[in-house]
Curated annotation (Swiss-Prot):
Belongs to the frog skin active peptide (FSAP) family. Brevinin subfamily. This is Brevinin-2LTa. Disulfide bonds: none annotated. It is found in: Secreted. Expressed by the skin glands. The keyword Nucleus does not apply. Its main location: secreted.
Length: 22
């Protein structure tokens, strides 16, 4: 559903930011 998509996007976005700031 839409909520799962939003949550997954948030998770990947956060992980990408954390990975980028290493």
């Amino acid at each position: 559903g839409l909520w799962e998509t939003i949550k997954n996007f948030g998770k990947t976005f956060t992980l990408n930011i954390l990975d980028y700031t290493k």
